[in-house]
């Protein structure tokens, strides 16, 4: 029998995942997103930066698994007026070594009681999970798609060859198969070049004969 647990389920871009860190925040509070934080800012220094507002509840700098800052954090307030005041007064001001960028944090993401089996199934069936855990299946689909395209190209090439054979038959040429078509074309090209070469030689010979005749006349 599957259990029921309280968590925050997030959805975006075809992906479904759990974000248990959002359980630390009271959904009734007003949260600010604090961006462009430097490596020198931690939870305590972020709290000190907003400590002048009495309704300040919590601050947190988001970090990766290795403990490195991800460059942003969150600040929450009980009072909406102080939330707006802090947003207006602190936006663009330096906290640590950088000027921060403030915006309203997403407030429609709230904790819910969900069935463990159901949420696990949704995560597995999301786009992200299909790409990560079923990569072979995705690659197979891509290969099949490319195979279809190749078959179409092959059929088109065969059709073009048949057309060439048909047109050659109309003009009197009767190639035995598609490979004889290029040979017939090459033969015609070679014959044309030979004719052109012979004409050039005849022209050169005529020029020499004319020059000799002219020299005899002068004598």
Swiss-Prot record:
Entries under PROSITE patterns matching the protein? RRM
Q: Where is the RRM domain?
A: 30-107
Originating organism: Schizosaccharomyces pombe (strain 972 / ATCC 24843) (Fission yeast)
Keyword RNA-binding on entry: yes
The alphabetized UniProt keywords are: RNA-binding
Span of the signal peptide: none
Protein known as:
Uncharacterized RNA-binding protein C22E12.02
Gene Ontology biological process terms, A to Z:
mRNA cis splicing, via spliceosome
- Ranges of Low complexity composition bias in the record: 150-169
Compositional bias segments (type: Basic residues)? 140-149
Domain of life per record: Eukaryota
**Is Zinc-finger one of the keywords?**
no
Q: Which GO terms describe its cellular component?
A: nucleus; U4/U6 x U5 tri-snRNP complex
Q: GO: which molecular function terms?
A: mRNA binding
User: What CDD domains does this protein map onto?
Assistant: RRM_RBM42
List, as start-end ranges, the regions of compositional bias called Polar residues: 176-186
Please list where the region (Disordered) is annotated: 140-219
